[in-house]
Amino acid sequence: AKISGNFRIGAPDGLSNFVLPVVISNIQNHHPNLNIQILSLPRVFNLSRREADLAIMVTPPKKGRFVTKKIVNYNLHLAAKNTYLEKNSQIKSKNDLKNHNIIGYIPDLIFDPTLDYLSEVIPNRAPDLSSNSVAVQMQMLNLGIGVGLAHDFALAHFPDIIPILKNKINQERAFYMVRDRDDLASEQSNLIASLLDNGIKSEVKRLQSNN
């Protein structure tokens, strides 16, 4: 089926930076008349106000006229750049982290408790360097200035950032596709949703298999 027009996807910035560009490129190759927009924001999207045609979320809404479908699980591991690990004291347990610079989210700007990855690993420890953006956190890690929790699908883009304590620390979350119930009547919207679902699933799995 031919699809065309504008279609806006709201997604967390980690997914937007490290997964969606490949996914939408593949879709656009098959549907050149489709204009795909990625709205990358570290917060929950308001589909009722049509901020986006479809949203990818880590925690789906519990109320409202929405249809939710789980897409795929993803993992996070503690990680640091190889040069950082060579220059600093060894990390053999979580207790060793107290001697290291920690990189993470800005605590009071975590809009979804599910994204508070760090407090599960290092309770009562605020990050020394923080950002509300996954992409910025990855660039900090890549500079070799600290240790942080990184998405496995993002680590695939940074070969010099190495997972640490891989067998001891493994956070698992999931991405969900959230749509307005009224959009289920649109054949085009259903097709795009299906393409995104399959594309995100396969790209996350491909990237995670590199670790």
Can you say where each PLM-predicted feature lies in the sequence?
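Short amphipathic alpha-helical coupling segments at ligand-binding clamshell hinges
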Residues: 184-198, 203
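Short, surface-exposed acidic/glycine-rich loop or hinge patches that mediate macromolecular interfaces
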Residues: 14, 182-183
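Residues that form or flank phosphate/diphosphate-binding pockets in enzymes
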Residues: 18-19, 88, 113, 187
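Short, well-ordered beta-strand segments
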Residues: 8-10, 55, 103, 148, ...
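Central regulatory/effector-binding core of bacterial HTH transcription factors
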Residues: 4-64
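C-terminal regulatory
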Residues: 49, 61-175, 202-211
